[in-house]
A protein has these predicted regions:
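Basic, polyanion-binding surface patches
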Residues: 2-192
Length: 192
């Protein structure tokens, strides 16, 4: 029968969406010590803002609310162990977890937040809002910085060099984002 959907299984309400970015969110505490956490529920909110779901009980959330600034770095294939680690342990229980992960930080030149040197792409953000009921945090992107090692010939970020990872919420795996399959805002013109 035309229009009939075959071979489709229903799973109910799940947080299954691809790709799910792996963000490493970092902020300073009141003493100026860097803390970071792994966050997968987030993305671009508007043309100059990022939105992330962060529970109020996280140390990183507390630090962001106090400092009004944070960074968001893309987790990469080369740093998967360290990126997973900062999501496994709490900064409340392991105050030196950034160091234990093997990360080194420098202060952003644009906001009062740490840039993790081992993660080559970072969004440097000012806090815009946080809703404790929904755990939704919005940050204004003040700057995007990238290590020169991940830049292509066009002097822009090259995904093949960056090798960002995505989280598979179904199987609890990390995967590297894949190959180029087309040209945005271009390939669809063939159907006009």
């Amino acid at each position: 029968m035309k229009g009939e959907i075959k071979m489709r299984k229903n799973f109910g309400v799940k947080t299954w969406l691809y790709p799910m970015p792996v963000f490493i969110v970092a902020a300073y505490d009141e003493e100026g010590k860097a803390n970071a956490m792994n966050a997968a529920w987030g993305g671009i909110y508007t043309d100059n803002m990022v939105g992330i779901c962060l529970a109020e009980e996280h140390q990183t959330t507390h630090n962001i609310l106090a400092s009004k600034a944070f960074t968001v770095s893309m987790a990469t294939a080369g740093q998967v162990v360290a990126c997973d680690y900062v999501g496994l342990v709490s900064g409340k229980k392991v105050p030196d977890k950034v160091e234990k992960a093997g990360f080194h930080t420098v202060k952003s030149a644009f906001v009062n937040a740490p840039v993790i040197e081992e993660l080559p792409m970072t969004l440097e953000c000012e806090l815009v809002s946080y809703d404790p009921e929904t755990c939704h945090m919005v940050g204004r992107i003040v700057n995007v910085s990238a290590d020169e090692t991940v830049l292509g010939e066009d002097d822009k970020i090259d995904l093949d060099k960056l090798r960002p990872i995505t989280y598979d919420p179904i199987h609890h795996h990390y995967r590297v984002l894949g190959e180029k399959v087309g040209n945005a805002f271009s390939d669809g013109k063939s159907l006009k």
